[in-house]
Amino acid sequence: MKTYRRQIREKILQALYTLELRETDIESAAGWLLTPEILEDPNAMKFFNLLLKSIKDNREEIDRYIAAHTFNWDMSRIAIIDKNILRMALAELLYCEDIPPKVSINEAIEIAKKFNSTDKSSKFVNGILDAIFNELKTEGKIKKNGRGLINHSPAKVQKTEPE
């Protein structure tokens, strides 16, 4: 069975980007991006709906974490793509209990490489997510079960130059 999670993450990123540029609701912005394969796969749609709802319902909390860890940046100055990759990854860390933190962070880094707003986007995303993850873990705010159980810190997910 094929998994569509990376594709779903990319579609949600595109929807979040659309929201930054024009007035619309997130469901409309994301819905037209989905492929028939995703629409017909109940597991894919479950993940899509969970991630989309988590971002929508918790955006203020997610943005507070980002703002607290981007000391020298006003939220409005962070590249739209990078900011929305961070939002998506934090929603996964906090609200998708079956996804390991290492996977959420690595997926965010890979998507940052693909949609990079600058040549340092993936490093920026990695650094911010690592700092936030460590804080959330220390505070006991990461709740995982099943495949999502925490087995080690993803602090060393990426230490090499992007390809």
From Swiss-Prot:
GO MF annotation list: RNA binding
Any single Pfam family the record assigns to this protein: NusB
The keyword Transmembrane appears for this protein: no
A GO CC term assigned to this protein in UniProt: cytosol
SUPFAM superfamilies: NusB-like (SSF48013)
One GO biological process term: DNA-templated transcription termination
Keywords, alphabetical: RNA-binding, Transcription, Transcription antitermination, Transcription regulation
Disulfide-bonded cysteines: none
Family per similarity comment: Belongs to the NusB family.
Biological function: Involved in transcription antitermination. Required for transcription of ribosomal RNA (rRNA) genes. Binds specifically to the boxA antiterminator sequence of the ribosomal RNA (rrn) operons.
Protein's UniProt name: Transcription antitermination protein NusB
